[in-house]
């Protein structure tokens, strides 16, 4: 079924062969509950608990392709979620740092990605993804899997010169767009909105009191 999904995504316009091969090699059904496994290859988001979803395959493929990974990059992912996107990044990049704010999802991803799949190039943290992972920065690529009203300043600061960030931008109940932010070697940023999308909102830890 993964092979058929990759072939369908190719027909839908995904052109990066490495992205399609990674999708073909990874069983999406492992990242959803057993009662939803029959729907794992449908092109729609599926619930994963805690009010969160695994994104539809086309959007996952589009975002991954938009990163323009060549292999070897240091990647920050904000929103581990089910771990499916994380596992794809692990196949395509050098090293992946992924942050998840929901404790239950963070624990589940750790068990699946590190213990079951043994992904040695993946680092996981439970915390506020909008703050990034400062001690591991800078990152050549940043991927955000929840929508923020604007690009979080901490993530912008952690994007390396020559780097590329892909993220949904917009309010939770209004129009959202997928934005690609590129930082030139001179530090100057350019951005482009490339796809209308609908994502769950990026959540934050409450301030310390």
Curated annotation (Swiss-Prot):
PANTHER family attached to this UniProt entry: PROTEIN-L-ISOASPARTATE O-METHYLTRANSFERASE (PTHR11579), PROTEIN-L-ISOASPARTATE(D-ASPARTATE) O-METHYLTRANSFERASE (PTHR11579:SF0)
Full protein name: Protein-L-isoaspartate O-methyltransferase
Pfam assignment, any one: PCMT
Main location class: cytoplasm
Described function: Catalyzes the methyl esterification of L-isoaspartyl residues in peptides and proteins that result from spontaneous decomposition of normal L-aspartyl and L-asparaginyl residues. It plays a role in the repair and/or degradation of damaged proteins.
Record SUPFAM superfamilies: S-adenosyl-L-methionine-dependent methyltransferases (SSF53335)
NCBIfam families to which the protein is assigned, alphabetical: pimt (TIGR00080), PRK00312.1 (NF001453)
Reactions listed under catalytic activity: [protein]-L-isoaspartate + S-adenosyl-L-methionine = [protein]-L-isoaspartate alpha-methyl ester + S-adenosyl-L-homocysteine
InterPro entries xrefs: PCMT, SAM-dependent_MTases_sf
CDD domains: AdoMet_MTases (cd02440)
Keywords: Cytoplasm, Methyltransferase, S-adenosyl-L-methionine, Transferase
GO cellular component, as recorded: cytoplasm
Similarity annotation: Belongs to the methyltransferase superfamily. L-isoaspartyl/D-aspartyl protein methyltransferase family.
Active site residues according to the UniProt entry: 55
Compartments it resides in: Cytoplasm
UniProt GO molecular function: protein-L-isoaspartate (D-aspartate) O-methyltransferase activity
GO biological process: methylation; protein modification process; protein repair
EC code(s) of this entry: 2.1.1.77
